[in-house]
Amino acid sequence: AFVWSHGGGQRAEKNRSVYFAKQGFANIDINWLGRPVKEDIDTNTDWGKVDPTQGPRFYSKALRKGWKVNLQPDEFSIDPIPSPRNSNWILLSMAGRRAITFLEKQPEVNADKIGFTGFSMGGMITALTATDPRLKAVAPFVGGTGFKYVDFPGGIVGSSKRPQFHNLEMYKNAIDPEAYWPHVKCPVAFITSSNDFHSTFERIYRSMDLLPHDDWRVSSNVHYNHGVGPEQWAVLNLWCRDY
């Protein structure tokens, strides 16, 4: 069994869960963005007095106009001072961990064989949740690398997201996956595209080099940006089947 975490602008999908079930996996698809699901299910995500979503375009109960990129306090943040808990990512990782707990309690699930995977922003959620000791394997898709505050090699000044963070050292120590990968004990399959803008090869391999073990793989299609092909879906199925 595993948790699936969708990407930015996306939603939980029944057909995707059916596909995974046909491969032999119980799964939960967390609808963190709060978009209405295609099946017109009335009961949907309600974040209450916090809002780690991408704004009212997707989430009807959004408290902000868009994605919160920094750790600064605002009227909807948890802490009144700069804090990791003011980051959307912390809330989304907490949602991921609650999804693990949900799977653990289902009668169809072997609680000793649970994994985590997700696409793009879901890959980032995967990276931040991968330290959970209950996980036996993880597979971030096109997202989840560290070092987003570092410019790309070759002197490409301004190619990082450093200006967004304001509290850079706090971000590096508590939010960037650079702080998480050294503590991930389970096997990792990093699935990406050769031309991906969100999980570039240099950041992937630099991140995987932080792992305290050698049980990791990288799978990429060629000449494509931010999407995966049938070979990568096969990698996910085989990875989860093994662990």
Regions found by a protein language model. Give the residues of each.
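Charged catalytic carboxylate motif
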Residues: 95-98, 235
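Proline-centered loop/turn at the N-terminus of a beta-strand
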Residues: 26, 113-115, 137, 187, ...
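Active-site nucleophile elbow and catalytic-triad environment of alpha/beta-hydrolase enzymes
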Residues: 166-180
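Catalytic cores of secreted or luminal carbohydrate-active enzymes
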Residues: 197, 201-243
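Short beta-strand element of the alpha/beta-hydrolase
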Residues: 1-7
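Cap/lid segment of the alpha/beta-hydrolase catalytic domain
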Residues: 8, 12-94, 145-159
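Primarily recognizes the serine-hydrolase "nucleophile elbow" in alpha/beta-hydrolase
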Residues: 97-169
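Short beta-strand/loop motif that positions the catalytic acidic residue
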Residues: 184, 190-192
